Amino acid sequence: MGKTIIISEQQLKESLSMQLINCKSFINTLYKYMTASRVLELLEAQEHMLAFVSPENWYDPYETKFLKTDYTALNGYKQPPIYCFCARMDNHNEEASWKIYKKGNEPLLRMSIRTIDLLLAIDKFAKEHECDVYFSKVDYRLKKSEIDSLHLPSSKYYDEFFSHFDDKQYVKVMSLKRWAFKYENEYRIFIVPRKPEAIVKYLKDNILFIPVPIEMITRYTFNPANKSNESLASQIEMAKYSAEYKLIREKIIKAHPNAKVYKSALYSKITQTSKI
């Protein structure tokens, strides 16, 4: 098990070659929701590789609106390829988060990631492979109609985003998300290769895989069980849930000894009202 890296925020800022966007400081912990199969794939691999996804793989048209925009009118700017890791800054909206990310029957895990360890690993990769890194807080200020019209000079936000356009401004527009999603409290870490050929061997299907220490993961939280009752079907479902949790917990600890693995207690304290 690797040693925990202890470093002050000021030392972190001075040692890292990355720019902050929409924020003035780093946060201690990031939360990442992933399916159990993907978490185990990360942990059980000989080299632990974290996925940074090209926005070309994103589904929301409002998040990709500015991905393939022609910016040549802005001093001939041509956008570079970028790769992004998305995570949340807190777990205050836990119930909504589990519902958003839980798809089908596959178990879901929330990883608590020590930000310092993650950023140091990213910084090392970036320096070795000639990449720029941006640590960005997602900007939720704009409503749907304001994002639709943002590219127009008449928009009150036009100068903020499109004057002196460069890679940093490009990352800023790629950090936009509609106001309706403000509850997500998302952060994004963007990697921008200065020499795309230097990262080719780490690319697959528009995803950039970067080596990271699994010690950066301080806690694994298993998705909550569904609200239960006294029915036989509910008891069977709870037994299946407990068996899945036990199996996945054993696999995590085998790959990451002494890992902290817990069930979410989201619904555990709810009691059924039988009579009013």
Per-region residue spans from a language model:
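Partner-binding and oligomerization surfaces adjacent to conserved cores of proteins
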Residues: 1-276
